[in-house]
């Protein structure tokens, strides 16, 4: 659907003029830019005719070098040459340190825990490094297309969280790009294949890149691309294959695993080259320093099997989440350069029971799909619309009394989406409420991830439970979250755009999903206990408040002692873990105070009507 654009008088483009928009695949290992030209989506080459831009940036004192020449210098200048920066996007310094053995950089902590990399040009954030790659792609596109871009669709892994998506948008802004939309990589691949093949039915998108893995189950119907479920691993990709081969070389050669950064880079380049050659050859000669040996495809298969198995486990979970059977999936689209590895293709084919689709170059398919979507969003496809229904990867919600997570938007909900839910106050006279926004699948706050906190102030003082606060969650088409809270009687309102300073740690999303399955029974029991404990506390406070006001006036001593005994029992049980006992005691205390509540109501009504004539009441 085209974005409406408002221009100054006399400045509107002529109806027949095409707006220049591109699709960008910002990858861990390689990046591409593509555009629709003469009705065909195709990658755009550089001056030397190369389509792929290595996602590598080498910093000199006065300039930044991007692409092939930068990657070639990685071994001799490892501290100033940044590769695989996508793995650092939206992460905190503590998360990055967990990748320390794989990243030969010198890190400094900046504001909001953001990691900075020391280079000869000064400190560089992952956002700045990504911006240099995007800037190179923008310049390539404007040179090739012969004009200024109105915007770009940039692809991200479906499993990128809010922080990682925001970091990507920030990088684009630094690069001078207007982001028309962030598009999930699997959805981009579906766009490319859906239009080219006119495909309908259930499709799996298996996307294994250099540093991330995504699996998505989609339903394609008459131009509608509906994502039924997503899964994946933000720290799984071809880089892991390279490290496995490098580890094999170290073991075979009897070397120390503690290599200097330059030697480490050189070894990884040798490992990557061997992996690529084994795509077509049965065995290759690997040489490093004074050592050389034979690496067979069978040995490579053994080395990478744990990583392939991890990807297949995510596939099975995504299929289960989608509510379909493996046999119903009619085709599997292969995306990402790492899907060229024969063992990967064989394993995926065996799992889904069909030959994977590789008609479109797996390195290009995401950029091509993004270009098609960019062309549509720029308004160049008047008679043709695409409806892309992406989903959120993890549930969103907020904290309620007792440390419970109340889900407002469940995982795998189609975006964009807005959902509202009403909450109330817990204490009499409460005039403010802390809204704690969470992400995750578990029942307790401590097991979920905190996204943001904000306060709603100015709530009119009322008895507990009388105020109505409507909390609205809005997730836009880019997967970014905004939350607002409004007290309905007074209209006071507060809101926040959720921009966490860094993202989930490696594998944390996958772990959160796994935990939600593994601990489902325990979580439900814990939630039930917390709910009864909160209800017990609420009832005890309400009864005590009533006793303080009317106990002496409306109850005799025997009644007061009976209520006090039941309250003591409930206090004792509420500190324990017997959910059923707490629930039963709540009922007993409610029963023993029923007569007291009725007398209070009668007294209130009598006081309200005192001194008024019957005709006044009837009127």
From Swiss-Prot:
One of its GO terms (biological process) is iron-sulfur cluster assembly. InterPro entries: ATPase_NBD, Heat_shock_70_CS, HscA_NBD, HSP70_C_sf, HSP70_peptide-bd_sf, Hsp_70_fam, ISC_FeS_clus_asmbl_HscA. It comes from the Bacteria. PROSITE patterns: HSP70_1 (PS00297), HSP70_2 (PS00329), HSP70_3 (PS01036). Keywords: ATP-binding, Chaperone, Nucleotide-binding, Stress response. The keyword Nucleotide-binding applies. One of its GO terms (molecular function) is unfolded protein binding. NCBIfam families: HscA, PRK05183.1. Chaperone involved in the maturation of iron-sulfur cluster-containing proteins. Has a low intrinsic ATPase activity which is markedly stimulated by HscB. PANTHER family: HEAT SHOCK PROTEIN 70KDA. HAMAP family: HscA (MF_00679). Belongs to the heat shock protein 70 family. This is Chaperone protein HscA homolog. The gene is hscA.
């Amino acid at each position: 659907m085209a974005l409406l654009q408002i221009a100054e008088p006399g400045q509107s483009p002529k109806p027949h003029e095409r707006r220049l928009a591109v699709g960008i695949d910002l990858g861990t290992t390689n990046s591409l830019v593509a555009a629709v030209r003469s009705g065909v989506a195709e990658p755009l080459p550089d001056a030397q005719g190369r389509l792929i831009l290595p996602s590598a940036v080498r910093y000199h004192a006065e300039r930044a070098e991007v692409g092939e020449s930068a990657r070639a210098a990685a071994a001799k200048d490892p501290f100033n040459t940044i590769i695989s920066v996508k793995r650092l996007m939206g992460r905190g310094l503590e998360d990055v340190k967990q990748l320390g053995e794989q990243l030969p950089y010198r890190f400094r902590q900046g504001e909001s825990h953001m990691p900075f990399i020391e280079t000869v040009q000064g400190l560089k954030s992952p956002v700045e490094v990504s911006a240099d790659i995007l800037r190179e792609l923008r310049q390539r596109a404007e040179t090739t297309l012969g004009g200024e871009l109105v915007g770009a669709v940039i692809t991200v892994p479906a499993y990128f969280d809010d922080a990682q998506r925001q970091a990507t948008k920030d990088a684009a802004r630094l690069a001078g790009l207007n982001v028309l939309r962030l598009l999930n990589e699997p959805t981009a691949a579906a766009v490319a294949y859906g239009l080219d093949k006119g495909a309908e039915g259930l499709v799996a998108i298996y996307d294994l890149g250099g540093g991330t893995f995504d699996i998505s189950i989609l339903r394609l119907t008459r131009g509608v691309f509906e994502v039924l479920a997503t899964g994946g691993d933000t720290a799984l990709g071809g880089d892991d294959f390279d490290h496995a081969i490098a580890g094999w070389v170290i073991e075979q050669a009897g070397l120390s695993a503690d290599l200097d950064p330059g030697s480490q880079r050189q070894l990884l380049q040798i490992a990557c080259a061997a992996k690529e050659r084994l795509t077509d050859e049965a065995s290759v000669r690997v040489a490093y320093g004074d050592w050389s040996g034979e690496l067979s495809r069978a040995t490579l298969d053994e080395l990478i099997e744990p990583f392939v198995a991890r990807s297949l486990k995510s596939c099975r979970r995504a299929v289960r989440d989608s509510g379909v059977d493996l046999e119903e999936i009619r085709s599997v689209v292969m995306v990402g350069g790492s899907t060229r590895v024969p063992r990967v293709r064989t394993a995926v084919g065996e799992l889904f029971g069909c030959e994977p689709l590789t008609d479109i170059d797996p390195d290009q398919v995401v950029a091509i799909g993004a270009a098609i979507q960019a062309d549509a969003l720029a308004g160049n496809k008047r008679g043709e619309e695409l409806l892309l229904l992406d989903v959120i990867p993890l549930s969103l919600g907020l904290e309620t009394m007792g440390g419970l997570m109340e889900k407002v938007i469940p995982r795998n909900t189609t975006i964009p989406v807005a959902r509202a839910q009403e909450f109330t106050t817990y204490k009499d006279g409460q005039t403010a409420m802390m809204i704690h926004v969470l992400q995750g699948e578990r029942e307790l706050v401590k097991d979920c991830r905190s996204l943001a906190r904000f306060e709603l102030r100015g709530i009119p003082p009322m008895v507990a439970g009388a105020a109505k606060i409507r909390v609205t969650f809005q997730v836009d088409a880019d997967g970014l979250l905004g939350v607002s809270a409004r007290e309905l009687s007074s209209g006071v309102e507060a809101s926040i755009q959720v921009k966490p300073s860094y993202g989930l740690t490696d594998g944390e999303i996958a772990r959160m999903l796994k935990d939600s399955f593994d601990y489902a029974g325990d979580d439900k029991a814990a939630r039930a206990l917390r709910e009864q404990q909160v209800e017990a506390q609420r009832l005890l406070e309400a009864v005590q408040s009533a006793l303080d006001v009317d106990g002496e006036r409306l109850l005799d001593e025997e009644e007061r002692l009976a209520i006090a005994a039941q309250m003591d029992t409930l206090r004792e049980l509420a500190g324990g873990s017997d959910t059923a006992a707490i629930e039963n005691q709540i009922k007993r205390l409610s029963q023993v105070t029923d007569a007291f509540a009725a007398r209070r109501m009668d007294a209130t009504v009598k006081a309200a009507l005192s001194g008024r004539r019957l005709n006044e009441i009837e009127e």
